[in-house]
Design a protein with these regions (language model features):
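Bacterial Sec-dependent N-terminal signal peptides
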Residues: 1-22
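Conserved, mostly hydrophobic/aromatic
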Residues: 27, 194, 284, 325, ...
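Short, well-ordered beta-strand segments enriched in hydrophobic/aromatic residues
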Residues: 27, 37-39, 73, 77, ...
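A low-complexity, Ser/Thr/Gly/Pro-enriched, surface-exposed linker/loop concept
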Residues: 28-73, 109-111
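Extended Gly/Ser/Thr-rich low-complexity repeat segments
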Residues: 31, 45-56, 81-95, 104, ...
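Catalytic and substrate-binding clefts that recognize carbohydrates or anionic sugar/phosphate headgroups
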Residues: 66-258, 268-270, 274, 281-286, ...
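Aromatic- and carboxylate-enriched substrate-binding clefts and catalytic-loop regions
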Residues: 101, 290-586, 621-622, 637
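Catalytic core of carbohydrate-active enzymes
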Residues: 452-460, 464-465, 472-482, 505-515, ...
Length: 799
């Protein structure tokens, strides 16, 4: 083994910095509780330049000592011990308790090559896929066109019970201890290399390549497929919220979504004309069913593929369409794609040298991002469209299309077999070929950056950026994105897998995640690994109606409630009429969602102004309860304990629910209080799902309205769920602009004293245009309710 020569560069301006030459390692205190570790085998420490991190180094007081083989760095929160002989690093808390070990001699590097696939042009043909029309060719050979370095590093943490994060994946994992996860961008994978532990730390790996995570129960190994430098951040955090706070310090704050996003969004594949969209909205309004946004999916273009131009035959005036939607008090989202083909837009990008391999625009070029925005602006933004659906932001896949027959193990599986490692290899190869191995996972981050920065740069912009997208990376939370989990198939098994997928994604510090309620594919063909829907009759099948309702109940308690999919329509009247069980169950959930918009919007502000996460795996709140560490089908949504029903009633008319210990729980539907730390059996009636509120919670609600803006000025009910002292802050602003960044918002603190049965409504802080100076609050407890007029001054209400 090679012993590294130790060179102490400096401990200056309070920043601890140590480096070692050939290979070279650097340890850098970013804050007293965040440490950056970089290692390279070639004597240099080049930046990976992912664009993920935007922090400013704090001036950290660090003491350096040496003890034989060890070099020791100590801040007010951490002690770092580095071994000169074996590259081991020990991370300790301020009381000298070991949090994490970078295992000695685990740093490894080996050559990594970037290949260009050479295709047989004579075999080229166009196929329809779930991602649109694609040109498919047979592979002749692979040529090496670039080189990088593959890195390995391993860690151990004593008695580690749970690991979470790494993005949204469909392997049916929550707790990642003992698991292997293949990380790349994909239709059904949103990779984000942030790992969180209940042992009080997080790790952010800052490299733009594909990765592999493996934990054997005691040792975690990360494999980075191609990077200039192994670069990771150690984040100390006593609880998961503290780890999230560290992640957001490094990568940026969460954008505050507009208020309307917390209403209901209706989508499907697809509305075929302006009239189709307008008539659908009119039907919602006729039925008085709340809705805030409707979505135009793909194939609105007149020619080619992905052309940001509406076909005048079916969409004669984009502005008239947007105006009509707005006249119905709704917002309009449109699907845009990064891969224009066979159209003037594609030729324009090619002529400007702004296209990468596989006909995706060069998102890493700022001028190309600006040019892409010019198309989106001219056809949509300038015409009044409100929100973006940046589809296919991976932006390529290698396992969604037909695979050449000579590479198949099974000729009956023309799209390959459902093997995670095999599919990871296919996808990382095609992404590396087009984007480069060192940035194969970064496309969505830069695509989102382009939409966000260019919209915000528009003169007179009054709309918050909303970007529904399918891929992600660290730092994307600052660009107004909501990630959804891709083109899922409708089966109860798939439903169950989706819940932990979202919880792990949101545990990374990126809180906005959603699904296609009802799942994308309802049909299946038995041949394609992804096309496995089990309800070919769609809404005609009562079994699918039940499935849809159960997913809708779950989606009600996600940051964005959105119905979408292929094969069958999704509007509420497709599931029955008023008075029938499925229609009424859907309407009940929509109404419940709208009642709670004051609560949801306040939670959103907590996310944007701090470390909070709205939808939370149970270890956020109850890390000491071992029963919840791998609880895949329950989670917290604010102070709600949400327990989706994930099997048909014919299999079971009840649903077992675990109530975490450390709290009492109040049944939302009945008001009955239960002690925590036990399992109970709940009825799984189609009209509801098991839903509990933590005793000691304040939940503000308001009257149901047909759209979120119509609720402004309505009385707000302050619901007290007693059992413990608690507080909450109601947040309000103008709802859909960035004036809140300049201080244009108001907050109203609420404090409940449980022993005294007293609520204190504190003095309102701040103001904004349109703020209600006088308003009605209804304070509701199990002992009764009181109606008060609030004028911004401290008010005490005793029961």
């Amino acid at each position: 083994m090679r012993i590294l020569k130790t060179i102490i560069l400096s401990v200056f301006l309070g920043i601890g910095l140590a480096a070692f030459a050939d290979p070279v390692l650097r340890i850098n205190f970013i804050t007293p509780s965040i440490v950056r570790v970089q290692w390279s085998n070639d004597g240099s420490l080049q930046e990976n330049n992912t664009g993920a991190c935007v922090y400013t180094n704090q001036s950290v007081k660090v003491e350096k000592t040496e003890n034989g083989d060890e070099i020791i760095f100590q801040s007010s929160e951490l002690t770092i011990k580095y071994s000169k002989t074996n590259n081991g690093i020990i991370f300790e808390d301020k009381d000298k308790n070991i949090i994490l070990n970078q295992i000695p001699n685990s740093l490894k590097a080996e050559p990594s090559v970037q290949e260009k696939i050479i295709y047989d042009e004579k075999s080229a043909h166009v196929e329809e896929t779930a991602n649109g029309k694609v040109t498919v060719k047979d592979i002749i050979r692979r040529d090496t066109i670039g080189r990088s370095t593959r890195y390995y590093v391993s860690f151990s943490s004593l008695n580690e019970k749970a690991l979470y994060g790494l993005g949204s994946h469909m392997e049916d994992y929550l707790n990642l201890v003992g698991k292997t996860l293949y990380l790349t961008q994909h239709n059904l994978k949103a990779m984000l290399p942030m790992l969180c532990s209940t042992n009080g730390y997080g790790l952010l790996f800052d490299a733009g390549c594909a990765m592999k995570f493996k934990n054997d129960g005691s040792i975690t190994t990360m494999q980075l497929e191609g990077a200039k430098t192994l670069d990771y951040y150690f984040i100390k955090g006593a609880r998961l919220d503290d780890v999230v706070a560290g992640y957001r310090y490094l990568t940026g704050e969460v954008s505050l979504m507009p208020r309307y996003l917390f209403g209901y969004t209706q989508s499907k594949e697809r509305y075929v004309s302006s009239d189709d969209i307008i008539n659908t909205l009119k039907e919602y309004r006729r039925r008085h069913v709340p809705i805030d946004m409707i979505v135009q999916d793909w194939n609105y273009w007149p020619e080619g593929w992905g052309y940001m131009k509406m076909n005048p035959k079916y969409y004669p005036s984009p502005k008239a369409l947007a105006d009509s939607v707005h006249s119905l008090n709704a917002k309009l989202m449109v699907s845009i794609w990064p891969n224009p083909q066979w159209c003037p837009e594609a030729e324009d990008f090619k002529n400007r040298g702004m296209m990468l391999e596989h006909d995706v625009y060069d998102v890493f070029n700022p001028e190309a991002r600006k040019h892409y925005w010019s198309y989106a602006k001219n056809e949509f933004y300038s015409q009044g469209f409100d929100a973006w659906w940046c589809d296919s932001s991976e932006p390529l896949d290698g396992d969604w299309n037909r695979i050449p027959s000579h590479s198949l193990k099974d000729e009956n599986k023309p799209y390959g077999w459902d093997d995670q490692e095999y599919r990871w290899q296919l996808n990382k190869d095609v992404l590396s070929e087009a984007l480069g191995v060192e940035r194969s996972s970064l496309y969505s981050l830069y695509h989102s950056m382009g939409i966000y920065e260019n919209q915000r740069a528009e003169a007179g912009n009054t709309k918050r950026v909303v970007n529904l997208t399918r891929s992600t990376y660290a730092g994307q939370q600052r660009y107004g994105t909501v990630v959804w989990n891709g083109d899922t198939h409708a089966s109860w098994k798939s439903f169950r897998q989706q819940i932990p997928s979202g919880l792990n994604y949101m545990a990374t510090g990126n809180p906005y995640w959603t699904v296609d309620v009802g799942s994308f594919f309802t049909r299946g063909d038995g041949r394609r690994w992804f096309y496995k829907g089990e309800f070919p009759e769609g809404v005609k099948d009562e079994n699918y109606r039940e499935y849809y309702v159960r997913m809708f109940q779950w989606g009600t308690f996600l940051p964005m409630l959105r119905s979408h999919g292929s094969d069958t329509p999704r509007e509420i009247w497709r599931f029955g009429e008023p008075g029938t069980q499925y229609y009424d169950a859907i309407l009940k959930m929509i109404n419940l969602r709208y009642e709670h918009i004051p609560y949801l919007y306040s939670l959103a502000a907590m996310q944007s102004k701090g470390s909070y996460t709205m939808a939370r795996l149970l270890a956020f709140n109850f890390p000491e309860d071992d029963n919840v560490l791998d609880m895949k089908d329950e989670y917290m949504f604010g102070d709600f304990l949400v327990c989706p029903v994930t099997q048909p009633i014919k299999e079971s008319a009840t649903r077992k629910v675990y109530l975490p210990k450390g709290a009492q729980w109040i049944d939302y539907w009945t008001g009955k209080t239960e002690e925590g730390g036990k399992w109970i059996e709940c009825k799984s009636e189609i009209s509801t799902l098991p839903l509990y509120v933590k005793a000691g919670s304040i939940i503000p609600t308001t009257e149901v309205a047909e759209y979120a803006a119509a609720q402004i000025g309505k009385p707000v009910t302050i619901n007290i769920y007693p059992g413990a002292d608690c507080d909450f802050t109601i947040y309000e602003d103008e709802g859909d602009n960035y004036n809140y960044e300049k201080g244009a918002f108001a907050s109203i603190p609420l404090n409940w004293n449980d022993k005294k049965n007293t609520l204190i409504i504190g003095q309102r802080q701040g103001s904004f245009d349109g703020m209600l100076n006088t308003r009605t609050f209804i304070v509701k407890t199990p002992k009764g309710e009181k109606k008060i007029t609030y004028k911004g001054q401290k008010t005490t209400i005793k029961f």
